[in-house]
């Protein structure tokens, strides 16, 4: 199967934003806490040479999920290049029940990536059985995407959970100086292949993805007032969809992409509104005392979570998507529900990222970073990205949903904040 056509169709949004520029200073993952309790796995160095280290990218992806703990190359009992060369007992003796082997070789104007996932303990029947294999042809530009594809397939085969390593993150960078220091950027989930969506002399806040991954909504102050902008990532076209009196902020697309929930103080008090994704007359959903902000849709689109200080201090509430009475959920703010509707992620009163099982009500603290903000879930619910304060600046943090793996994605050219994880971008 060839990736090239699929890559061009899926990621044309990156190439077609004519007014955008690629940013030189990318955010990159720096490990803060490892995954000692995760399932050990081996990703054997791929045979061949390419501008990107395919096996390392695959190993890093699996590690970042918190589900796997790839062993170091120095710990590998052998380095097979084919399934026939695998000695299952050598691997099972050190506690490895699955290994990934592969090759990367020049092919035309790009490279051919081939891999095999091998069972070393006979869980599938016989030790040495090939659980999955595939081959892709990619251009140099898409080598990392090809590696992430391997990761997605291996991850799904071993966990029965769809991989999310070919997704992207949007975030805001406040650069250290310059005439337009505020930028909305998009990058691969691990910080590579970063590009600038928009830059401004005035603050930019709260990017939010449309469910098809083709648009970003965000808050812009470029006209000396807060307004909501929706930008098409394919054409670069921007449209101001809300510029009401007072503050307009915290946009959130509905699951079907047809509506936009947001917060506005157009009537003097900050309340939650919903309007069409292209603008129009908004419908007010909240009322009464207190400020209401940070709306987030449930996966089925039937309810909305939001943050309100109506009880005297900020707390997360849940209401019907058409408005009406609201029920307190807990936490302090920035709530988001996983795509399966089972888990709630939010910020608690100590500014830590917590997850709450919506069936049992049990909560678990995932981060103890200073002043955690804006948590955003990967579309499979396995990883969470958020911003925190380090020193005098803001950085992005990555944590697996089980809390095993923690990493930082510091920016080298400014403060990084307001992360938003994309939906699945493959077809």
Swiss-Prot record:
Keywords, sorted A to Z: Cell cycle, Cell division, Periplasm, Signal
Q: What is the effect of changing residue 322 to N?
A: In strain: 1479
Known Pfam families for this protein? PD40, TolB_N
Keyword Calcium included in the entry's annotation: no
Q: What are the coiled-coil residue ranges?
A: none
Give the location in the cell.
Periplasm
One GO CC term on file: periplasmic space
Q: What is the effect of changing residue 21 to V?
A: In strain: 1479
Result of altering residue 129 to A: In strain: 1479
Signal sequence coordinates: 1-23
Q: What's one GO BP annotation on this UniProt entry?
A: cell division
Effect of substituting residue 6 to H: In strain: 1479
Q: Does the keyword Magnesium apply?
A: no
| Entry-linked InterPro entries | 6-blade_b-propeller_TolB-like, PD40, Tol-Pal_TolB, TolB_N
Q: Where primarily located?
A: periplasm
Q: How does it assemble?
A: The Tol-Pal system is composed of five core proteins: the inner membrane proteins TolA, TolQ and TolR, the periplasmic protein TolB and the outer membrane protein Pal. They form a network linking the inner and outer membranes and the peptidoglycan layer.
Q: What does this protein do?
A: Part of the Tol-Pal system, which plays a role in outer membrane invagination during cell division and is important for maintaining outer membrane integrity.
Its family? Belongs to the TolB family.
Protein name per the record: Tol-Pal system protein TolB
The species is Haemophilus influenzae (strain ATCC 51907 / DSM 11121 / KW20 / Rd)
């Amino acid at each position: 199967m060839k990736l090239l056509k699929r890559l061009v169709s899926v990621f044309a949004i990156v190439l077609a934003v004519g007014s955008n520029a690629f940013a030189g200073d990318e955010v990159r993952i720096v490990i803060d806490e490892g995954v000692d309790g995760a399932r050990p796995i081996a990703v054997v160095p791929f045979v061949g040479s390419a501008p990107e280290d395919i096996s390392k990218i695959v190993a890093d992806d699996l590690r970042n999920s918190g589900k796997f703990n790839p062993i170091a190359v120095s710990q590998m009992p052998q380095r097979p290049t084919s399934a026939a060369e695998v000695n299952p007992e050598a691997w099972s003796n050190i506690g490895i029940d699955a290994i990934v082997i592969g090759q990367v070789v020049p092919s035309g104007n790009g490279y051919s990536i081939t891999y095999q996932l091998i069972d070393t303990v006979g869980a599938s029947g016989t030790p040495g059985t090939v659980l999955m294999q595939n081959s892709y042809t990619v251009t140099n530009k898409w080598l990392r995407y090809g590696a992430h594809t391997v990761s997605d397939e291996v991850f799904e085969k071993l966990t029965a959970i769809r991989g999310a390593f070919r997704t992207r993150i949007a975030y805001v960078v406040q650069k250290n100086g310059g005439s337009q220091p505020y930028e909305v950027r998009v990058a691969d989930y691990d910080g590579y292949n970063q590009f600038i969506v928009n830059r401004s002399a005035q603050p930019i806040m709260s990017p939010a993805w449309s469910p098809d991954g083709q648009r970003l909504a965000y808050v812009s102050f470029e006209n000396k007032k807060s307004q909501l902008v929706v930008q098409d990532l394919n054409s670069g076209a921007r449209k101001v969809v809300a510029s009401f009196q007072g503050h307009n902020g915290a946009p959130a697309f509905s699951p079907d992409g047809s509506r936009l929930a947001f917060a506005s103080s157009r009537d003097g008090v900050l309340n939650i509104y919903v309007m069409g994704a292209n603008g129009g007359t908004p419908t007010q959903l909240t009322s009464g005392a207190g400020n209401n902000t940070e709306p987030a849709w449930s996966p089925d689109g039937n309810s909305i979570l939001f943050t309100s200080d109506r009880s005297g201090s900020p707390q997360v509430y849940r209401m019907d998507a058409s408005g009406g009475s609201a029920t307190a959920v807990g936490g302090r703010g920035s709530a988001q529900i996983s795509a399966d509707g089972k888990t709630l992620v939010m910020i608690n009163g100590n500014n830590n990222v917590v997850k709450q099982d919506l069936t049992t009500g049990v909560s678990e603290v995932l981060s103890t970073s200073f002043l955690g903000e804006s948590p955003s879930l990967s579309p499979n619910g396995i990883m969470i990205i958020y911003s925190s304060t380090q020193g005098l600046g803001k950085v992005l943090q990555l944590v697996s949903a089980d809390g095993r793996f923690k990493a930082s994605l510091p920016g080298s050219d400014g403060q990084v904040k307001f992360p938003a994880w994309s939906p699945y971008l493959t077809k």
